[in-house]
């Protein structure tokens, strides 16, 4: 399973990139709004940092014509831009049109298997089921990822699954087991993946033993 970072903060992206584990970036209007910067300018900054890995940038328009227009504009920013569109009939129309022009697409806000299947049929490069948001309303977010993965295997569908709305390390482990191709996660969760109390204790013990040996 590959790792994307879910943020528009360049410092967070730099930290993840330096770890050598970053396979892509996902952004959305809410994340960019938090940064208080020009959307296109920030996307260029991100692309410069991460090189040629996928950078998902979401359209704002709700109609198909507007999504297609915005998607083409976003794709001009850098060759590794993936156009992110919401799961709606208009979104499917936009995905179909953009895919015909070899523009990679990520259909977001997936909450059931049929949505993922339709997005894939329209030509989506990625689908993004939202785990945490389903868990918030008492539904099985991880079960959704597993079901989508099974359907894609049965029907030999090449669309990749991005586990989104990932809140904790357990989500990451379970997404990998469920068959997600990618997990997109914020920096705090990435950092928590590196941590375990016994790792910390082990480091402290090694250092203490080393200091004793030098006396």
UniProtKB/Swiss-Prot annotation:
This is Probable transaldolase. GO terms for cellular component: cytoplasm. Pathway: Carbohydrate degradation; pentose phosphate pathway; D-glyceraldehyde 3-phosphate and beta-D-fructose 6-phosphate from D-ribose 5-phosphate and D-xylulose 5-phosphate (non-oxidative stage): step 2/3. Belongs to the transaldolase family. Type 3B subfamily. Its EC number is 2.2.1.2. GO terms for molecular function: aldehyde-lyase activity; transaldolase activity. It catalyses: D-sedoheptulose 7-phosphate + D-glyceraldehyde 3-phosphate = D-erythrose 4-phosphate + beta-D-fructose 6-phosphate. Transaldolase is important for the balance of metabolites in the pentose-phosphate pathway. It is an enzyme of class 2 (transferase). PROSITE patterns: TRANSALDOLASE_1 (PS01054). Keywords: Cytoplasm, Pentose shunt, Schiff base, Transferase. It is found in: Cytoplasm. One of its GO terms (biological process) is carbohydrate metabolic process. The active site is at 84 (schiff-base intermediate with substrate). Transmembrane segments: none annotated. NCBIfam families: fsa_talC_mipB.
């Amino acid at each position: 399973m590959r790792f994307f970072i879910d943020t528009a903060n360049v410092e967070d992206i730099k930290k993840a990139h330096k770890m050598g584990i970053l396979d892509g970036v996902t952004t959305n209007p809410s994340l960019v709004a938090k940064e208080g910067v020009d959307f296109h300018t920030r996307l260029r900054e991100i692309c410069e940092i991460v090189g040629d890995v996928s950078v998902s940038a979401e359209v704002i328009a709700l109609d198909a014509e507007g999504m297609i227009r915005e998607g083409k504009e976003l794709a001009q920013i850098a060759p590794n831009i993936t156009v992110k569109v919401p799961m709606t009939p208009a979104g499917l129309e936009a995905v179909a049109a953009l895919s015909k022009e070899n523009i990679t697409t990520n259909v977001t806000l997936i909450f059931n298997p049929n949505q993922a299947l339709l997005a894939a049929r329209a030509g989506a490069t990625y689908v993004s089921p939202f785990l945490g948001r389903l868990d918030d309303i008492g539904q099985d977010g991880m079960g959704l990822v597993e079901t989508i993965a099974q359907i894609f295997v049965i029907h030999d569908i090449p669309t990749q699954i991005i586990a989104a709305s990932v809140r904790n390390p357990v989500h990451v482990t379970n997404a990998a087991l469920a068959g997600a191709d990618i997990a997109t996660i914020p920096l705090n969760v990435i950092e928590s993946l590196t941590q375990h109390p016994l790792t910390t204790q082990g480091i402290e013990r090694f250092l203490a033993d080393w200091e004793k040996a030098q006396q």
